[in-house]
Each structure stands twice: as C-alpha cells, then as structure tokens.
Amino acid sequence: MTELQKLEAGLEYCFFDEEVAQRKTNAVIKCKQLNAIAPDDFKEQSRAIKDLLGSVKGEAYINAGFYCDCGKNIHIGRDFVANFNVTILDIAPVHIGDYCMIGPNTLITTVGHPLRASGRRKHLAQAKPINIGDDVWIGGNCVILPGVNIGNNVVIAAGAVVTKDVPDNTLVAGIPAKKIRELEE
C-alpha cells in the first residue's frame, strides 16, 4: 500500500512521501497566486478560487492570507466568505455548506500526528474529514480539529477550539468548545 493509499484510507502515512508532498506543492503555488490578486479584481479571484478548490457551488470570497494543503479536497457551498489569514489543511476532504463565514486567523485541520514520539520521528500523520453544515459562522481565531462534524445554523465563538461534533442550532465557545446555548432556527 502506498503512502497516498494509506492517507486516503484514513491510516497513518508518511507526510514526507513524494506523492503526498507533490499535492501540497501544487496548492502552495496556487495559494500564492490567489493571494497576489488585487482585492478589487473579483473576476480573477473567482477564477483562481475555482481553480484551487475541489468544488465551488456559488459565489465565494476569500481574503488574502488563505492557505491550504491540497485545495482539491475543499468543497464549498453558496455564498462562502473567508476572512484574512484562514488556513484549511485539507489532506482529507473538507465539506463546507451554503452561507458559511469563517473569521480571520482560523485554522481548519484534517491532519493530526501520533502522540507517540516514535511515530512523530517517522514523520507519520493521520487525516480525518471535516464536515461543516449550512449557515455556520466560525468566529476569528478558531481551530477546528480533524474528524469534526458541525451541524447547520451553528455559531463557533471567537477563539474556540472545536474537538468534538457540534449539533444543529448551537452556539459553542471555549477551549475545548462547549455548548453555550441553543439557537433559533
């Protein structure tokens, strides 16, 4: 089994593998191009976003400072907004629903590393997909960890670290993020 096959099967894989690294190199180049586009050139931004990401359902606005691992594993819905300095480490798929907003300096990461030092010395990682529903607002300086599913109509308060699934119609905050209250539909 190749390292790429291990990655896609959700198993531990070596992140220095050539095939895995090549995906990242392509994304780094495309992110650099996207971030260099003039902020008022919406047509060119739209073209670059659609070239970088796996799928874009409708309009998407991504501010400068956007970075991702692969790009093609990110699938976004209608009217997507990412503020400044958003990073999505999409070694595994990231699905983001319609009408979602991501605040500045936020990290969405599908990849983690072993707790065992011996595994980290071998450059091992494991990727788990992330799913984000419709009408989600992720505040600034948040972290969404691997394998998390976020429901519809959810607000993630600024600075939260989301380690577990979040049900529909919920406001969460804190480190780790905990339910504060239910939201009206």
Residue ranges and their predicted role:
Residues G159:
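Rossmann-like dinucleotide/phosphate-binding beta-alpha-beta segment
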Residues L4-Q5, L52, K122, P129, ...:
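Short secondary-structure boundary/capping segments
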Residues M1-E59, A177-I180:
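Terminal amphipathic alpha-helical/low-complexity segments used for targeting or macromolecular assembly
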Residues P39, F66-I76, V81-I150, T170, ...:
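Flexible, glycine/small-residue-enriched loop-and-beta-strand segment within the central core
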Residues N149, T163-K164:
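Active-site/ligand-binding-proximal alpha/beta "capping" segment
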